[in-house]
Amino acid sequence: MATDQGGGDMRGLVEQIARALVDEPEQVSVQAVDGEQVTVLELRVAPNDLGKVIGKQGRTARSIRTILSAAGMKLRKRFTLEILE
């Protein structure tokens, strides 16, 4: 049960970061897909906000993934971020 809560916390974290970056925060959604070893967080944003979430040369996306990785270490669980169109 603790891992589900951790996944939910990470989902909320990614959602909050993404909403701060985009022009249409109501279109942001994050879904957690639990696997055996990794929880995949699927981030969806409006098509015109996709570039803002990815950033120049993927820097913003890489930063979000780094935050996820660091927070996941505390929970002893791995998280990956997929940005979907």
Spans of model-derived segments:
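Glycine-centered tight-turn and secondary-structure capping sites
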Residues: I54-G58
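RNA-contacting regions in translation and RNA-metabolism proteins
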Residues: M1-L50, S63-E85
